[in-house]
Amino acid sequence: MNNKNYFSFLITKFRFKIFVLIIFLILFSGNTQIFSQDEIEIVESIPLETSLENSDLPRTLNVWLKMINEAKESVDIETFYFANEKGKPLEQIIAALKDAAGRGVIVRIIADSGFYSKNDKSVDELEGIKNITIKKIPFSNLAGGVMHAKYFIADKINVFTGSQNFDWRALIHIHEIGIRVKNKDMGRTFSELFETDWKLCDNNFYGITNMAVHFFVNKDNPVTVSSDKYGQVMMYPAFSPPDLNMPGLSSEEDELIKIIDYSKNRLLIQMYSYSPKTRSKEIKYDRIDNALRSAASRGVKVKIIFSDWAIRDEATDFIKSLSAEKNIEIKFSSIPQYSAGFIPYSRVEHCKYFISDNNISWISSSNWEQSYFSNSRNATIVTDNIRINEELEKVFYRSWDSNFTEKVDIDRKYESVKRN
């Protein structure tokens, strides 16, 4: 080989090595955004005929349908209940689940047994279909509360959780906030919770006490998810009740209080209900209340929207007292009725989220009452990301600045609103 050919050979070999090195660095340097399969969406349900319809966030119905329609192996749903009516949008979800089962996807559903026994039985539409199994979890017997979580997982990797029940009204007549995360570690953590509750449907506690927990995503082991829209997002889930959480899972209530306690500048909170009520008439639940007052006393600006369904008995006095604190502003939200007439159990802000400072966001199924943390199954995702925080800030102020919210008047006598 002459010098010229040898030199060309060396150049070609060098270029090939550089190419291999670049590919190696892309794949293994930790910069997963380029080829990342992770996805994040903040998902909103909007009551029709309201100013909230200006939101450009993905709608719950569309996100759920996409998740189910793209599922290849499994769909696991844990929800408080199903409520469908002929011609309403939940029919599309039920049809999608049937179609998924028809193409071989294994569908499992957990619903609360107590609510099912006394209320809507729309989940029965899926009974007896090949590849679909439905179980009822006796949460009242297990922990004294209800299975109040609203989450599902497609293919063990694509997770949705939030305030949305599998209720047709939660798709078009109730304000809801949820989050979809496609990430294998988050999917695995939620899937293990589902497997535990699947066993608990049969009163089998083995799943709680004998579970390997080294891979769970939690407050001490958060995951960083790469998203085209939001960039790098650090996140972890938290669950209730602690007594029925597997070892290694974070507690919702503890994380909630910690975030409030660590807040330095602001808290924007939108919550369906808030109450000091406990099982004992002599004891009031004031852990969140004390944390909010403490935050306000150190200069944190606190704004809260409660739905008008929070107006009941002593809860109203509790809210009035909180609103009298310096640095705390509270409004009640009253969604206008639908033009076609009154719809029971609808036209309400059912959201359960808040943001802290400019980076922490909380999206949950828990209302702010003791039983939701101590006795009921609920799920939350906590994120650390400025863009998600900004997204939820927009959601908050669309309600805060709307014509259907008004500041709490401590001198006014409020009456409970009609629900059904």
Where does each model-flagged region fall?
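Bacterial N-terminal signal peptides
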Residues: K17-G30
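Intrinsic-disorder/low-complexity regions
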Residues: M1-K4, G30, R293
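Charged, low-complexity intrinsically disordered terminal segments
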Residues: T32-K135, F139-N420
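Bacterial N-terminal signal peptides that target proteins for export
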Residues: N2-V20
